Every structure is written in structure tokens, then in C-alpha cells.
Amino acid sequence: RRIFCVADERGELLTAGHTVHCDVYTRCTKAQAIQMALRCMNPQVIVCDELGTQADLQAVEAGLACGVVFVASVHCDTLEALNRKPPTARLLAMGAFETLVLLDGRVNPGHAVKVRTLA
């Protein structure tokens, strides 16, 4: 059994009454949520969406240094575009991501159009 934490700053990932056994951080930035989880909960996995700010990426780096696995999303349509974003390019270079899943968000939300193993 793994210890999960969810950084859900706008309450979009898990709604009230969810049945998933995990700690959920809402109403704070992803970076703050990740930092609090690392300090207080000793998570094995942190789930968050829409990584984008420098603070988000620094918090993910801190989590990776602690051995935490991340399930995260980034708004991007190709691996090449992901590499053009300096913060995410740095995470890719570090080997932070094992798998890339591209979703067809505009036409068919939630539908995977490509799955690529990176590690």
C-alpha cells in the first residue's frame, strides 16, 4: 500500500465526498501543497495537474530528491513542445518522467492519442 497525496489547488481533481484514501491539499498553490506534503506526510506518490510555474517545478524537484513519484499533467501537445519549455525541459533531462501520455483534449477530452515510455 502506498501513501498518496493530492495537490489540488482549485478542487478539480477530487471533490468533496471522494472515496480515495489519501491526503488532499486544496486552496493553496501546488508548490505549497507539495512542500507541505513532503514536510508532514512522507508521501510515496503525489498527484497534481497543470505544472507550469517555476515554483511548481522546484517543488517537484524537491519531491524527486526525496524519492517521491509524481503523477502530473502539463499543458503541451507534443514531446518537442514540452522540451521547448525550460522548466519542463529540465525535468525531462533529469529523468523525472517515465511515461508521456498525450491527450486529445480539444476534440475528445480524456482520450489518449499517444503513450510513450521515456525511461
Predicted regions and their residues:
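P-loop NTPase switch/communication element
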Residues: R1-R39
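Structural signal for conserved beta-strand scaffold positions within catalytic alpha/beta enzyme cores
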Residues: V6, D23-T26, A72, L102, ...
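Switch/connector loops and helix/strand junctions flanking conserved nucleotide-binding motifs
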Residues: L13-A16, E80-L82, P109-A112
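Histidine (H) residue identity feature
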Residues: H18-H21, H75, H111
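Short, low-complexity, polar/charged sequence segments that are solvent-exposed and flexible
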Residues: T26, R90-L92, A119
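Conserved P-loop NTPase nucleotide-binding/switch module
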Residues: N42-P43, V47-L100, G105
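Conserved P-loop NTPase
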Residues: E98-A119
